[in-house]
Amino acid sequence: GKLFDLIRNDPALRANTLVLVCSDNGPERGAGSAGPFRGFKTHLYEGGVRSSLIAWGPGLLAKQNHVNRTSVFSAIDLVPTLLDLTGSPHPKNANYDGESLPGTLLGKSAASRKAPIYFRRPPDRDSFYGDKDLPDLAVRDGKWKFLCEYDGAEPELFDMETDRGETKNVATQHNELV
């Protein structure tokens, strides 16, 4: 409370402060809920890889209490986004997997990253939580999410615009994508 009050009440701080709260993965099984999403920590389903990013900045955000449920924005997008947002130079020879999306972070845009996001499950987690044969690899590209084993077996494809809970595998209907 005191820190947020200080920021709200100081015009210079209010105009130039952005507080971010985020997590690196979904909840541990039994320690929380992934809401409508399938899976838990160590799973490559959305319940394991999706987590909230809370941004607070009374002088920077387009709207207060705004929830963006549609943009694809990854933790790897934070560094280039924050560098651009603050007008800081990018380090020489720095290559980022992330994309700069300051408008999305500030709630002024619903833009999503353009490049795919790749995921790999650690090899020692094949039967974590007693679940067998969890997918080893995943890629999120636009509205599509593809999961499979290391050898490409057991493909799963989900349309994330219509099936956020990853309940309907449409891989057989979209061989051209698989």
State what each model feature region is.
Residues 1-3:
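Short, well-ordered amphipathic alpha-helical segments that serve as non-catalytic structural scaffolds
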Residues 5-64, 74:
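Histidine-centered active-site microenvironments of extracellular/periplasmic hydrolases
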Residues 26-33, 39-44, 64-67, 71, ...:
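C-terminal cap/loop subdomain of S1 sulfatases and analogous C-terminal strand-loop tails that border
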Residues 49-54, 84-87, 150-152, 177-178:
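Short C-terminal domain-edge/linker segments immediately following a structured domain
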Residues 163:
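Intrinsically disordered, low-complexity polar regions and short flexible loop motifs
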Residues 167, 171-178:
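C-terminal structured subdomain/cap of oxidoreductase catalytic cores
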